[in-house]
Design a protein with these regions (language model features):
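C-terminal and inter-domain tail/linker signature
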Residues: 1-138
Length: 138
């Protein structure tokens, strides 16, 4: 059964989900410039999985941090795809439930994930990803 358009965003009152969707779409195209337009210049990007693989110890900071993240993805992953399965909006925040699939050094990776975004004035101000472990196989 398909969910109604307003699912997780009652009455479609907020556009935060659109901002986050645009960032995911830009990432899928590896369109850094497209993503930058939706990210605050002082954003904090706590994307620990890729950061750890790239040898970083803290979050990516600001637009330069987003540039570093895109470079790190290209450097440490042969392939990395983000899959959004459900998006929930609470004014000011967007919760994305989904998973990642990737390939690194010939190994296939599938992990359940939850991304918590903060959005203000039409731009993402932060994101934190929670790695929920190996994706259950059905």
């Amino acid at each position: 059964m398909a969910r109604p358009d307003y699912y997780g965003n009652p009455a479609g009152l907020t556009d935060e989900a659109g901002v986050v969707r645009a960032i995911y779409d830009a990432f899928a195209r590896r369109d850094l410039e497209g993503a930058l337009g939706y990210v605050s210049p002082d954003c904090e990007l706590d994307l620990a999985g890729t950061a750890r693989l790239a040898g970083r110890s803290g979050p990516y900071q600001g637009h330069d941090g987003l540039r570093d993240y895109f470079r790190d993805v290209e450097r440490v992953w042969e392939e990395l795809l983000l899959h959004t399965e459900d998006i929930r909006v609470i004014p000011g925040s967007v919760i994305v439930i989904g998973h990642i699939t990737g390939r690194r050094q010939g190994l296939v990776v599938s992990r359940s994930s939850v991304w918590t975004w903060r959005v203000k004035d039409g731009r993402a101000t932060s994101v934190k990803v929670a790695d929920l472990g190996d994706l259950a196989q059905t």
